[in-house]
Amino acid sequence: MKTLLEKTSDKLVKAFLKNKIIAPIPSKYTKKLSEAQKLRKLCESKIKEPIIGFKAAGTGIPLIKKFKEKEPFYASVYKRNFLKNGKSVKINKSTLGIELEVCYKIKKTFFSSKGQITMKNISKYISYMAPCIEIV
C-alpha cells in the first residue's frame, strides 16, 4: 500500500508530465519545509526528463529565519520549462501570482563532476544567468 507521500508525488508527477492542474496537495507538504523537501526529491526522482539547471528559493534572510532554515532551497529546472523570448505561459483562475526570479543554465559537465563544487569553481559550470518567472 502506498504512503500519502508516494500518492501525492504520483499525482504531482502525472500532472507535471501531462501539463494538468490538480486539486491542492495536503497542507502538511506546504507547512513544513522538511516534508516539502521529501516530496520534491521523490517527485524529481520520478521525472526522467533532461535537467538544464536549478532554481533557488528562499534566498532572502528574513524568509530563511522565518522557516528556521540554514540555507536556501532549490528545485530542478527541466528543459521543457525553459521558454524562448516571445513564448506564452498558460495561467488560470487558480494562479496566485507570478514571481520574478533569477535562473542559471548549468553546463552538462556539472552533472558528471566528481569533485567538490565550491564558490570558487562554480562559475565554470554556469553557461548563462537569466531572468525567469515562477507561476505560483
Regions found by a protein language model. Name each.
Residues 2-136:
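Catalytic-core "active-site belt" of small-molecule-metabolizing enzymes
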